[in-house]
């Protein structure tokens, strides 16, 4: 009985931390469900049936997202492959194993089967997906030093420990299904509008009304998606700082700082517009560098 209580307490704490850390993804999922529910109910005379259908779709999407299939789908979309060549294995795997070992020492509950993958994208990037996937772009491998790559890997493992990577998988799957539902609804609305117009004596008025309804629906969806992007971006920016903190905790703060300096030096994007800033998933790189420098300077003073 005590073991059961301990398990439930531990599980409750983990769920609570996940909910608190990923409130934006949960809110975004709720909004997806609401809009998809309204869209399906518009095509059904039975509201209860529409709600059941929407709930069933979301159960399937979440089931796919949290399964290995969800990670496989996203890896396939990014054309990610395991580290295969002898040169890449000899270079990258020792770096990853060093960082991974430190992460496991800090967080024993971290998945023991995380695998490193490579995408042939030329931009400098690294990201975590689900529970078992860390990806490096070819651009990062070619442009960053071994120590800088360690910093990037440590940062991504930080995302995994907080559940960010799993929440992102669920969000991507939800977005995909939502977009599909919206597309189907728009096509059906358009077809019904044309049919109704052809059979109506006031076909011109019917066409105009159908066009207005279609336009309002499209703009409402666009506004909803933009609002959702802002909510997710706001949450993501705060999560980036926490992943930086994790890299620092496991001993790779200096390496990550140098990684960010390198990324900042190669950033040719210029100033962000207001729209770009609202939808940006990462804070300004210089702000992250300054934050890490403060931590490292305090550490030097203490020791």
Residue ranges and their predicted role:
Residues 1-123, 177-238, 265-269, 298-303:
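Hydrophobic or amphipathic, alpha-helical segments that drive membrane association/targeting
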Residues 106-130, 232-236, 242, 247-303:
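Active-site-proximal gating segments in proteases and membrane effectors
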Residues 122-146:
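Active-site scaffold of zinc-dependent metalloenzymes
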Residues 136, 151-159, 163-164, 243-244:
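Active-site recognition of the HExxH zinc-binding catalytic motif
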Residues 148-149, 168:
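Conserved catalytic/dimerization core of cyclic nucleotide/dinucleotide signaling enzymes
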Residues 157-176, 252-253:
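Catalytic Zn2+-binding segment of zinc metalloproteases
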